[in-house]
């Protein structure tokens, strides 16, 4: 039989020390304490970020799907990092031009890519201060500049 955990009147220090050491095996705990979200993620811990469109790109979907997902390469204003962002809805890529200012949000789960789009962790929400969904539904027009 294994030894198991210490059980005794004077075992509290041993138990709490062991728990403290074992917590570092938990990914979420480690990320929170080391501040990884602020250091490594392009958004720096924020939910949204603005950027300038560098180019339009088509990203091939992963197997077993066969499609070219419409995306844009964006340089973030806050730190100059370059990211790829997904453009949702059919024909929305036509509303986005190079050098436009776009607002990006997270896409997928906990900073990972979503579905069959490899390496794309963000999606476009606004173009030139106008919501992409409003443009798509023809409720608003993109401002001329």
Curated annotation (Swiss-Prot):
Keywords: Hydroxylation, Ribonucleoprotein, Ribosomal protein. The modification Hydroxyproline is found at residue 64. PROSITE patterns: RIBOSOMAL_S12. GO terms for molecular function: structural constituent of ribosome. InterPro entries: NA-bd_OB-fold (IPR012340), Ribosomal_uS12 (IPR006032), Ribosomal_uS12_euk/arc (IPR005680). CDD domains: Ribosomal_S23. It holds the Pfam family Ribosom_S12_S23. GO terms for biological process: translation. One of its GO terms (cellular component) is ribosome. Belongs to the universal ribosomal protein uS12 family. This is Small ribosomal subunit protein uS12.
């Amino acid at each position: 039989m294994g030894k198991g955990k210490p059980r005794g009147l004077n075992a509290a220090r041993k138990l709490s020390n062991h728990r403290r050491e074992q917590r570092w095996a938990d990914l979420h705990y480690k990320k929170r304490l080391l501040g990884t979200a602020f250091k490594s993620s392009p958004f720096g811990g924020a939910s949204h970020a603005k950027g300038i469109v560098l180019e339009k790109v088509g990203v091939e979907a992963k197997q077993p799907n066969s499609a070219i997902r419409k995306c844009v390469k964006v340089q973030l204003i806050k730190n100059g990092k370059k990211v790829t962002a997904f453009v949702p809805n059919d024909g929305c890529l036509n509303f986005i031009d190079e050098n436009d200012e776009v607002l990006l949000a997270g896409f997928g789960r906990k900073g990972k890519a979503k579905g069959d789009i490899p390496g794309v962790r963000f999606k476009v929400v606004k173009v030139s201060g106008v919501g992409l969904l409003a443009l798509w539904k023809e409720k608003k027009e993109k401002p001329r500049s």
